[in-house]
Amino acid sequence: MKNKVRTIHMVGIGGSGMSGIAEVLLNLGYAVHGSDMSDSAVVRRLRKIGAEIFIGHGAGNVSDAEVLVKSTAVRDDNPEVLAAVEKGIPIIPRAEMLAELMRLRTGIAIAGTHGKTTTTSLTAAIFDVAGKDPTVIIGGRLNAYGANARLGEGEYLIAEADESDGSFLCLFPIVNVVTNVDMDHVDFYAGQKEIDEAFVTFMNKVPFYGANVVCGDDPGVRRLLPQVKRRVVTYGFGKDNALRAEVTSCAETSVFTVFLRGGRLGEVHLGQPGRHNILNALAAIGVALEAGISPEHCIEGLARFGGVGRRFERRGERDGVTVVDDYGHHPVEIAATLATARSVYPDRRLVVVFQPHRFSRTQALFGEFCKVFEPVDKLLLTEIYPASEKPIPGVSGQSLAQGIRQVSNTDVTYYQSFDEILAALPGVLRPGDVLLTLGAGSVTTIGQRYVAGE
């Protein structure tokens, strides 16, 4: 029955969640076409491997589709959605398509407010080294694949599970990971209670023979554990965790020893710096051990891991300035990234360009955003990246800059456009500085343009 549908249309096919699914569907032999608002490297890659992609949305784009896949960011009045309704074409959310793919394999779902992409990628690296040949779908470009997805021949599908719209509850994995539970996605959840309920439901969806691998150091996770009725494996730095790390160093690289219920598994050398990445690696080890992978393969896989795009990614140098780019856009993520930057570059001046992401997040976490940039020597702040949201009165990049000045000593300047920032950078930067671009939107282009000499 499932083979009756062969032609799939994806609205917003270039998005981080959609593109990986599209790539796997193409590799499975489905005809995939889709649309996106702009051309991009992701769109070009999908075209290269066989997808037909339209720039812009139009009713004619769905003419021969047998099913339409969309993310929750796509509105019901989108012309392609309306055309599908008129033609009687089934419309399904992105997560439902991911759930169908997961049904073909033994599913592993990586969830949490922060660290999902890196943890998914680290898990995939271990499974690759162990010869498991997994199918992998993540939200960022994995350097080892040159893409954010691959179709494997093995039994496992390792996927990043998106809690932002509750869609991770569509999945039926055998093993779950929860890296942390923080307040976020206020455009969807009414408050922390709703977020907590979603994660509890997620953890209780694993079968009786499955497991939840969770960060025992995270207060949000610990708060929920009494409500979890399925098996739990905790990881972290605390001695009460089942899987524990003792850190030797986490500056340029991370070196740590792993213990399982008191027994030493071995020393890990990870190329990525930062305590948050050690936690991500512990989660990956926990999943691998659940799959019967040896500690030796875990250590080898982590040692070989080549990183993920936009996760403390070094983009180059210009005039003695080192340029680093990071996806961090929530105060907790930003704090971890700044701590890593200070650890890796302890004696260098840190200049940050930050593009806030979503009006709703900026409003809900305004106080945290105002305080998190204290470790920065100079902050250049630009306008909020809307991510399909409508503006909220009184919430802007400029109002955030004013708030930062009121509650902290951070040296902050607001710029309305990227061109203004690029024009200002030569007067701000000095040889030996580190320029860090931060945000989930388009801010990465500033580092690219600066290195290119624009």
From Swiss-Prot:
Pathway: Cell wall biogenesis; peptidoglycan biosynthesis. GO terms for cellular component: cytoplasm. ATP binds at G112, T113, H114, G115, K116, T117, T118. Its main location: cytoplasm. GO terms for molecular function: ATP binding; UDP-N-acetylmuramate-L-alanine ligase activity. InterPro entries: Mur-like_cat_sf (IPR036565), Mur_ligase_C (IPR004101), Mur_ligase_C_dom_sf (IPR036615), Mur_ligase_cen (IPR013221), Mur_ligase_N (IPR000713), MurCDEF_pg_biosynth (IPR050061), UDP-N-AcMur_Ala_ligase_MurC (IPR005758). Belongs to the MurCDEF family. This is UDP-N-acetylmuramate--L-alanine ligase. It comes from Nitratidesulfovibrio vulgaris (strain ATCC 29579 / DSM 644 / CCUG 34227 / NCIMB 8303 / VKM B-1760 / Hildenborough). The gene is murC.
